[in-house]
A protein has these predicted regions:
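N-terminal nucleophile
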Residues: 1-194
């Protein structure tokens, strides 16, 4: 997950510099934590606005968070447990505090961790609809969509809903077999030599 890091004052930023949106495509082929570290060694984030990148590595049972403050890249390893990360252009710290409290409270519900629970959590207006509820509603900004990816030993399923999660009626996911995920033809990519 790539999050804007708004509570850090960026060092001199070149507005023609690369977008943070280029981070994920550069890392997408990484299959392990060591692969990711190798890519970071050659990546150039110079000029990019601050960001946080969270990587979850099931085979290593590790969760890592990298933080680029627009000058240097730091990292932190987290315990292998359920966690949430939040970002807000108003205040990352306040978003973490208020949204985090809603998540910790919901964690005690009997069906915590299930897909219906996760959808309801993301549609939550705990503390009232506003800038720091999980489903954001501000005068100038709102949550625009909700996506979920479910990975099992044999399949990858992705669903997406356009609109605020609190208005979500249903998601019609697509599913592919994991073996097909590595097949370029599945994605419409030609491997024939030109």
């Amino acid at each position: 997950a790539l999050l804007n890091w708004n509570d850090v004052t960026p060092h001199s930023i070149d507005h023609k510099a690369p977008s943070r949106g280029q981070v994920i495509p550069a890392l997408i082929d990484s299959r392990s934590l060591s692969d990711l570290h190798a890519v970071f060694d050659v990546s150039n984030f110079k000029g990019m606005m601050p960001f946080r990148l969270v990587g979850v590595f099931p085979s290593e049972q590790e969760i890592w968070e990298w933080r680029w403050d627009s000058k240097q890249l730091g990292f932190q390893a987290h315990m292998w447990e359920s966690r949430h990360w939040f970002s807000s252009s108003l205040s990352d710290d306040r978003a973490e505090s208020l949204r985090g409290a809603a998540c910790r409270s919901a964690q005690h519900e009997s069906f915590a961790g299930s897909v219906p629970w996760l959808r309801r959590l993301h549609a939550s207006h705990a503390g009232g609809p506003g800038p720091f509820s999980l489903c954001v509603h501000r005068k100038d900004v709102k949550t625009l969509s909700y996506s979920e990816i479910m990975v099992t030993a044999g399949n990858v399923q992705m669903g997406h809903f356009r609109g605020s999660p609190c208005t979500m009626a249903q998601i019609d996911p697509i599913e592919i077999e994991r073996a097909d995920c590595l097949d370029p033809a599945v994605w419409g990519i030609s491997t024939a030599a030109s």
